[in-house]
Curated annotation (Swiss-Prot):
PROSITE patterns from the UniProt entry: DNA_MISMATCH_REPAIR_2
A Gene Ontology BP annotation from the UniProt entry: mismatch repair
PANTHER family on file: DNA MISMATCH REPAIR PROTEIN MSH1, MITOCHONDRIAL, DNA MISMATCH REPAIR PROTEIN MUTS FAMILY MEMBER
GO molecular function: ATP binding; ATP-dependent DNA damage sensor activity; damaged DNA binding; mismatched DNA binding
Recorded name of the encoding gene: mutS
The organism of origin for this protein: Xanthomonas campestris pv. campestris (strain 8004)
Function: This protein is involved in the repair of mismatches in DNA. It is possible that it carries out the mismatch recognition step. This protein has a weak ATPase activity.
Protein name from the UniProt record: DNA mismatch repair protein MutS
Signal peptide residues on this chain, from the entry's feature table: none
Family: Belongs to the DNA mismatch repair MutS family.
HAMAP family associated with the record: MutS
GO CC annotation terms, alphabetical: cytosol
Chain residues that bind ATP: 625-632
């Protein structure tokens, strides 16, 4: 975690006069940004010195060299070429580093001494807006956290997209869940002790002075930035902790960006109750966009993302990580998807969007006045598509699609301006010229004609000079260093006319200048400079004109993003045979022929669909069956179906009826991460504890193999207690997979006591010769075998080891009897202290009792035996 008082080890020595003028200039710039890497412009390179050079050489794998000495010591140096610096900058930002760009702001050719330099830009992981430094399908967020006795305030901004939001949470667990959801690239926290463990060592965490996180100063900063008298319109007037975080974030942005931020026009308060809650473990276990091994392939997002545009892809990721509980919003999304499917409009929309660029981020660069020439042409082409998109949407009867139709707006004037002003194929860089279209400005056209006519003049001059000099190989050319020249080979140089003045000597040629060519050069170069100057003026005018339309254009880009996501949902529904879910107000979770969307997509064989039926009288399924039989897949698929329904997507099932859901909570062992130094069992218990404390009757809980990380009896006792707590206290919807067959007795106890709605289901397997065939079908009732030894054989365990295990199993079964729950007395749910699940260990009293034959005892002998037995207890 980077601290606020970290200082660069490079210091001006007491003998500062010993340093060279260049190093004095470097130290002056570096002293203002001690915690940042300083890219110091020197000609065609950005150089780094001293500790910056050592660090950059290590991180970027570039050469560490030295540049003479200064202050009596060698100067460590490393550098990157200016023309390729963005690639190196992107790598540093991805590693959590921040960089200050120090440019030459004077003209080296005109400078009498040292050229003037100034830090003109600061690039940090959370504030980048350059296209080359961004992941086009993922938000790049800057977050600030403040804390109080009541909890934590969060503020986060997507500077590249123009979004600014806040929230408040009341616990460390909720804070960790929000950070897992948002995945900020950079995180600002007060420089204080006792921050949660999960923040320590996290890449991109910046400690800032605590006084920057003050609620009152934050409020004043927000009012000044948005030019308001109060914050009630944003809904954060009574959120001091969130306001403090927002003020700290805004201060950091203004400090690093060194310019106005006109694209941040409001701040929104996220309401936690509007979304389904998922903690960090649940997101990890369900592999929404990243697998537990860190791979991003074969995830739910990978299957679901059929968006055409980058901005649509980012919106889909946000939806996926924040499934909504707002039934009206979701029903409108489902209806919109259905309308697109029924009319075939999804195909038309997606085809039109193939010519649509990332308007959201382009508009940010327009607002920040950093837009490049091709940003203008992309925006122009995007606005030109609007009439076609509006024509597609106009006849559709979906309320949500009609809202999007209205939000698209009509931007004919802006489109016409860009069509007339921007060249059809503008260059990558403005300095190359040719950005403004011919015919847009008469003065610019005249200046360009001078440059164009210059080419013909040079052709004519070359022919005349060849004729007058008699040198057939004479050439007229130009380079940026020496300007225009007449070139004659070494062998012909003696024939050069007397009025030729030598300009440059090469190995095989001599270059000359004449008064006529010099006069022409002055005229042409002046025209080109004036042309670029005029073009820059027109370019700035376009930025001004677009700045006045930003609000409407941002709404348009937002509507296009949502339309892209909805059309993608429609495409996926048809391609994958998904159906529209039904969201009910009554409690239920009924899924017919459900499938796991990711497993089905990657399997070569047909996926075996399964049903799920949960309701107030049937809230828990105890799931048994062999390892590899599909228990975890079955649990996850139902959670993913619920999640998909709550982002507005169709779902992989023939029918899904879903009542209110407030949380999805999971404990699945495949997600164990020991990086924090906790044992597997400790992780298991911590995640289980979170679930038991947070699950409600509207929560969906997945529990996979609880108790496996400890001894058999401890594990069984814990699994039993957890199952009882979920069924009896939390009363949530629970899918409880276990290898403890004894737990299947809970269903019998539930029925006997009219209790908490527990039922048994199982997944079966069939032995076919030496092969084991997993059926993957969920059936009612408990499993009768675990097939553990068969699975071990499938995994490649040596035959001798498997045979030894079979012999040992036979011995254990003979000694202890079959401990299957069907042969055991069920434990009543209303008496959680009575397990009634274990085969009791033998004792002296038990052995003595077994030795008695009641039919052979007299009354006196029976009484004496009873006393003996009592004494043994």
């Amino acid at each position: 975690m980077q601290t606020a008082d970290t200082k660069d080890k490079t210091k001006l020595s007491t003998g500062a006069a010993e340093h060279t003028p260049l190093m004095k200039q470097f130290f002056a710039a570096k002293s203002d940004y001690p915690d940042l890497l300083l890219f110091f412009r020197m000609g065609d390179f950005y150089e780094l010195f001293y500790d910056d050079a050592r660090k950059a050489a290590r991180l970027l794998d570039i050469t560490l060299t030295q540049r003479g000495s200064s202050g009596g010591a060698p100067i460590p140096m490393a550098g990157v070429p200016v023309h390729a610096y963005e690639g190196y900058l992107a790598r540093l930002v991805a590693l959590g580093e921040s960089v200050a760009i120090c440019e030459q702001i004077g003209d080296p050719a005109l400078a009498k001494g040292l050229v003037e330099r100034k830090v003109v830009r600061i690039v940090t992981p959370g504030t980048v807006t350059d296209e080359a430094l961004l992941d086009e399908r993922r938000d790049t967020l800057l977050m600030a956290i403040s804390r109080s006795k009541q909890g934590y305030g969060l503020a986060w901004a997507d500077l590249a997209g123009g979004r600014f939001l806040v929230n408040e949470v009341d616990s460390v667990d909720a804070l960790e869940a929000e950070i897992a959801r948002l995945e900020p690239a950079e995180l600002l926290v007060p420089d204080e002790d006792n921050w949660p463990e999960f923040l320590r060592g996290r890449v991109g965490v910046r400690r800032r002075p605590p006084w920057l996180f003050d609620a009152d100063s934050g409020r004043r900063q927000l009012l000044a930035f948005f030019k308001l008298h109060d914050l009630s319109g944003f809904g954060i007037d009574d959120k001091p902790c969130a306001t403090a975080a927002a003020g700290a974030l805004l201060g950091y942005v203004e400090e690093t960006q060194k310019q106005r931020l006109p694209h941040l026009t409001s701040i929104a308060m996220e309401v936690a109750s509007e979304a389904i809650s998922m903690n960090a473990a649940t997101r990890r276990h369900l592999e929404l966009d990243t697998r537990v091994d860190g791979d991003t392939r074969n995830t739910l997002l990978g299957v679901l993302d059929s968006t055409v545009t980058p901005m649509g892809g980012r919106l889909l990721r946000r939806w996926l990580h924040r499934p909504l509980r707002l039934r009206e919003v979701l029903v409108q999304r489902h209806h919109a998807v259905g309308s697109l499917i029924d009319t075939g409009a999804d195909t038309d929309v997606r085809e039109a969007f193939r010519a649509l660029g990332d308007l959201e981020r382009i508009l940010t660069r327009v607002a920040l006045r950093s837009a490049r020439p091709r940003d203008f042409s992309t925006l122009r082409d995007g606005l030109a598509l609007l009439p076609k998109v509006r024509t597609i949407l106009a006849p559709l009867d979906s309320p949500r699609l009609q809202t999007l139709y209205a939000e698209l707006g009509e931007h004919d004037a802006t489109a016409h301006l860009l069509i007339s002003a921007v060249a059809e194929q503008p260059p990558l860089k403005f300095s190359d010229g040719g950005v403004i279209a011919t015919g847009y400005d008469a003065d610019l056209d005249e200046l360009r004609r001078l440059s164009t006519n210059a080419d013909q003049f040079l052709i004519d001059l070359e022919q005349r000079e060849r004729a007058s000099s008699g040198i057939a190989t004479l050439k007229v050319g130009y380079n940026r260093v020496h300007g225009y020249y007449i070139e004659i080979s070494k062998g012909q140089a003696e024939k050069a006319p007397l009025h030729y003045s030598r300009r440059q000597t090469l190995t095989n040629a001599e270059r000359y200048i004449t008064e006529e060519l010099k006069s022409f050069e002055d005229k042409v170069l002046s025209a080109r400079e004036r042309s670029l100057s005029r073009e820059k003026l027109l370019y700035e005018g376009l930025l001004d004109a677009l700045g006045g339309e930003l609000e409407g254009l941002k709404r348009c880009a937002s509507a296009l993003s949502e339309l892209d996501v909805l059309a993608g949902f429609a495409e996926r529904a048809q391609a994958l045979d998904w159906s529209q879910p039904e969201l009910e107000s009554a409690p239920c979770l009924h899924i017919e022929r459900g499938r796991h969307p990711v497993v089905e997509a990657v399997r070569d064989q047909p996926f075996e669909p399964n049903d799920l039926d949960l309701h107030p009288d049937r809230r828990m399924l105890v799931i048994t069956g062999p390892n590899m039989g599909g228990k975890s897949t079955y649990m996850r698929q139902n959670a993913l179906i619920v999640l998909l329904a709550h982002i507005g997507s169709y779902v992989p099932a023939s029918r899904a009826v879903i009542g209110p859901i407030d949380r999805i909570l999971t404990r699945i062992g495949a997600g164990d991460d020991l990086a924090r130094g906790q044992s597997t069992f400790m992780v298991e218990m911590a995640e289980t504890s979170y679930i038991l404390h947070h699950a409600t009757p509207q929560s969906l809980v997945l529990m996979d193999e609880i108790g496996r990380g400890t001894s058999t009896y401890d594990g069984l006792a814990l699994a039993d207690a957890v199952a009882r707590h979920l069924a009896h206290t939390n009363r949530c919807y629970t899918l409880f997979a276990t290898h403890y067959f004894e737990l299947t007795a809970l269903a019998d106890a539930s029925h006997a006591g009219g209790g908490s709605g527990i039922a048994n289901v199982h997944l079966d397997a069939v032995e076919h010769g030496e092969r084991l065939v997993f059926m993957h079908a969920v059936k009612d009732g408990p499993a009768n075998r675990s097939f553990g030894l068969q699975v071990a054989a499938l995994a490649g365990l040596p035959k001798a080891a498997v045979q030894q295990a079979r012999r040992r199993l036979a011995e254990l079964e003979q000694r202890g009897g079959d401990s299957h729950a069907a042969e055991m007395a069920p434990a009543a749910l209303d008496a959680p202290q009575q397990f009634g699940l274990f085969t009791a260990p033998s004792s002296a009293a038990q052995e003595a009792l077994q030795a008695l034959d009641p039919d052979e005892l007299t009354p006196k002998q029976a009484l004496e035996a009873l006393y003996r037995l009592k004494a043994l207890l």
